[in-house]
Amino acid sequence: GDVYKRQGEFMFKQFTMELAGRTLRVDIGRVCAQANGAALMHYGDTVVLSTATASKEPREGIDFFPLSVEYEEKMYAVGKIPGGFNKREGKASENAILTSRVIDRPMRPLFPKDYRNDVTLNNMVMSVDTECRPELLAMLGSAIATCISDIPFDGPCATTQIGLIDGEFVVNPSQTQWQEGDLQLTVASTRQKVIMIEAGANEIPEAKMIEAIYKCHDVNQTVIAFINKIREEVGKPKHAYTSCAIPEEMFAAMREIVTPEQMEEAVFTDEKQQREENIREITDKFAEAFAENEEWLAVLDEAVYQYQKKTVRKMILKDHKRPDGRAIDQIR
């Protein structure tokens, strides 16, 4: 990337690529130096600032990964300042919430399963050009900011949108083309595979839809190569973190107390109350056995759930039977 300096001192690095006939420009190190990762994204005249931040320590007492994604649309991005009595901007619009979800969905599974540090991905729309949709830029910006940060992340991933105008595909369409075309398709991919598809369409042939998905996936590969280039030049080494995974020796001890066969017996009933009662009895049995071990007791419920999940998965995939006795191809 090009290095920009002021009075001989490093200011920021700039990377560019051609994407769907327009220039995608990424400035790294220009703003938000205190964030774990930040990218100032330019596409046409649309500008979005994407940042990725993570807490130093894992959050206590939770059994999920605390990721929050924010997409902020500001009135000044389209050159308007709210007038009158109320100068503040209201709560996030429906479009902003849906965009946050589309950013979250492909990225969440790429963080480590045992990571419990709070992570916030913030996308602020600074300026809007109706030819280049800011939503797409935020999706790419979040991926770049996270990839170059020191937050553990199994990326990169990239997102492409496709519209269909008069039977022709338009990659990364303008706002008008997006709203008026016959297809609104958003596809996120890693290098190996497609990881998310979001679509709305008038009726179009299945073959056309499949072609569009492949086309998005191909475009994503060029963007991923670009992100990898950025990461090689400015990426930080990933930080070590405290794993919140359930220890393997705990599972081994659980299998000694309640064998997989006994667990199968406990879940193999079509009475939900009965199944819950069986699991409660098993949990009590474990609680008694691990009474001395406070660390294990703290994660007992999650461990029992995972043991139950593995058992049901094995029953379905290997033995072709479901917990309520139905065959795998049988409908209620």
What do the predicted segments below correspond to?
Residues 113-119, 154-156, 223-241, 292-302, ...:
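Flexible, glycine/charged-enriched surface loops at secondary-structure junctions
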Residues 1-4:
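Short, small-residue-biased leader/transition segments that mark boundaries at the very start
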Residues 57-67, 96-105, 165-185, 332:
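Conserved alpha/beta core surface patches that mediate binding of polyanionic ligands
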Residues 10-55, 59, 63, 242-332:
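Extended amphipathic alpha-helical scaffolds
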Residues 106, 137-149, 212, 219-220, ...:
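Stable alpha-helical structural segments in soluble proteins, enriched in small hydrophobic residues
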Residues 150-264:
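Mobile "lid/hinge" segments at catalytic clefts and subdomain interfaces of large enzymes
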Residues 25, 49, 103, 113-167, ...:
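Glycine-rich anion/phosphate-binding loop at the beta-strand->alpha-helix junction
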Residues 35-120, 125-127, 132, 198:
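Glycine-rich, flexible beta-strand/loop modules in the N-terminal catalytic cores of phosphate-handling
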